[in-house]
Amino acid sequence: MTDSSNEHETENPSVPNPDNEIQDLQQEIATLKAELKEKNDKYLMVLAESENARKRMQKERQEMMQYAVENALIDFLVPIESMEKALGFASQMSDEVKNWALGFNMILQQFKQVFEEKGIVEYSSVGQKFNPFLHEAVETEETTKVPEGIIVEEFAKGYKIGDRPIRVAKVKVAKSPAPQEKEEEKK
């Protein structure tokens, strides 16, 4: 009867085979693990993209604030330079005007301090090699006293924040004299 009962078990499909059931469950576990890994990878990717977007937006917001400050301060450059020029003549004026000039000079220094705090610095150009990124050549001067391309005069100061100019210097640049032709060759 044991033989017939064993045959009966293998022949009866309604009774589950434990080995097949374990295999099916292991297959289902493997499939679920793969799906979980895929979903987790997607989640981590979306999380990283979200963090990158947040950082990018924060950086853009800081840059916009910096540009707004720069633009506001740039508007003060011309009046400040005018004040510097006017104060340059104070030594030729009366004592009363000199006292006023002293006060205006203090105000001018406060403006310059604000510029420095915001990272805006003026740069010197005379004696430097012409750099189109930092300078605007408004004049050239033929000379043999300095090499070609060297700045010989500055008409307006240049200002920058870090390495980025916010206003280029207006300058006069040295130029080699044109070769002079002999009068004989002209005839």
Swiss-Prot record:
Tell me which CDD domains the record gives.
Answer: GrpE
Per UniProt, subcellular location reads as:
Cytoplasm
UniProtKB keywords? Chaperone, Cytoplasm, Stress response
Q: Name one GO molecular function term.
A: protein homodimerization activity
* Function in brief: Participates actively in the response to hyperosmotic and heat shock by preventing the aggregation of stress-denatured proteins, in association with DnaK and GrpE. It is the nucleotide exchange factor for DnaK and may function as a thermosensor. Unfolded proteins bind initially to DnaJ; upon interaction with the DnaJ-bound protein, DnaK hydrolyzes its bound ATP, resulting in the formation of a stable complex. GrpE releases ADP from DnaK; ATP binding to DnaK triggers the release of the substrate protein, thus completing the reaction cycle.
Q: How does it assemble?
A: Homodimer.
What is the name of this protein? Protein GrpE
